[in-house]
């Protein structure tokens, strides 16, 4: 699963704030 799919979990790098 790409980090772009779940940017919410990767709050350390909010590249895609959906």
From Swiss-Prot:
GO terms for cellular component: cytoplasm; cytoskeleton. Its EC number is 3.6.4.-. The lineage of its organism: Eukaryota, Metazoa, Chordata, Craniata, Vertebrata. It comes from Crocodylus siamensis (Siamese crocodile). It is an enzyme of class 3 (hydrolase). One of its GO terms (molecular function) is ATP binding. It catalyses: ATP + H2O = ADP + phosphate + H(+). Belongs to the actin family. Actins are highly conserved proteins that are involved in various types of cell motility and are ubiquitously expressed in all eukaryotic cells. Essential component of cell cytoskeleton; plays an important role in cytoplasmic streaming, cell shape determination, cell division, organelle movement and extension growth. Keywords: ATP-binding, Cytoplasm, Cytoskeleton, Hydrolase, Nucleotide-binding. It is found in: Cytoplasm, Cytoskeleton. This is Actin homolog.
